């Protein structure tokens, strides 16, 4: 999914990053790893840009409240007999094949309904990174199913100094990559928004609140999502250093 009217960074899929648009970089990262790839958008400018670099694109409604809803509409328009639909945010230009394979591997368990990824925070990261509300945290159970996602720091360590929290517990940062069994995608998009979802502005809480299980895979790869113009600057620096 890639929409034009982002509140924090309008037109970000069309922002230039190292001579290519952000959406082209995302598309090039995922083709070859999945059986098929489409950009689902609500804007003719994005549609034209995708066609210009030879990508596949599907026009969807401007009224969707989430990327998951947009994915489902695109899925119904594309048709085909897909077992699993992978939802890759259109602002993740450095998504890696290893991450896509990790989320695909979650479906080797026949009971998996929905899957996503996390990355462990490291003990040497500054506490401000853990506090960042734009980087949701995840807690999981023994079977690596998500218990909860929050913009707050979870868990709260009652008997430890805050500066020692990352040393005393492994915290997990959510990576905004989802995959769903096709029939589950149909079901969850029919659900009304939930109270937890509205409180945290995290759509995955709707699924948990309605009893769906979210299998969690681990990635050690750092991702750089483009949410703000400042993020784009960081991405440009990352790209220069990598090359």
Regions found by a protein language model. Name each.
Residues 1-41:
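N-terminal glycine-rich phosphate-binding loop and ensuing alpha1 helix
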Residues 34, 80-82, 109-113, 212:
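Short, high-confidence coil segments that cap the C-terminus of an alpha-helix
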Residues 38, 44-102:
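Short phosphate-binding loop-to-helix
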Residues 41-42, 95, 180, 227:
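A conserved hydrophobic position in a structured secondary element of the catalytic/binding core
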Residues 80, 165-243:
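Conserved alpha/beta core of the MobA/IspD/sugar-nucleotide pyrophosphorylase nucleotidyltransferase superfamily
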Residues 96-188:
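Conserved core of the sugar-phosphate nucleotidyltransferase
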């Amino acid at each position: 999914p890639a929409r034009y009217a982002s509140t924090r960074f309008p037109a970000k899929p069309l922002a230039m990053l190292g001579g290519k648009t952000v959406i082209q970089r995302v598309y090039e990262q995922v083709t070859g790893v999945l059986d098929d790839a489409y950009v689902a958008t609500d804007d003719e400018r994005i549609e034209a840009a995708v066609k210009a670099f030879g990508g596949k694109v599907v026009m969807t409604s401007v009224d969707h409240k989430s990327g998951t809803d947009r994915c489902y509409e695109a899925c119904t328009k594309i048709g085909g007999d897909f077992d699993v639909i992978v939802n890759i945010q259109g602002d993740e230009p450095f998504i890696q094949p290893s991450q896509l394979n990790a989320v695909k591997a979650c479906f080797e368990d026949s009971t998996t309904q929905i899957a996503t990824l996390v990355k462990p925070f490291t003990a040497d990261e500054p506490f401000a990174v853990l506090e960042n509300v734009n980087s949701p945290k995840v807690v999981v159970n023994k079977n690596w199913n998500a218990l909860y996602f929050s913009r707050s720091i979870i868990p709260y360590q009652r008997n430890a100094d805050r500066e020692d929290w990352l040393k005393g517990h492994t915290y997990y940062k959510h990576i905004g990559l989802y995959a769903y069994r096709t029939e589950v995608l149909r079901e969850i998009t029919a659900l009304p928004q939930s109270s937890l979802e509205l409180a945290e502005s995290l759509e995955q809480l709707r699924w948990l609140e309605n009893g769906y299980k979210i299998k969690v895979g681990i990635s050690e790869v750092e991702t750089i999502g483009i949410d703000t113009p400042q993020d784009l600057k960081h991405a440009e620096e990352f790209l220069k250093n990598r090359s």
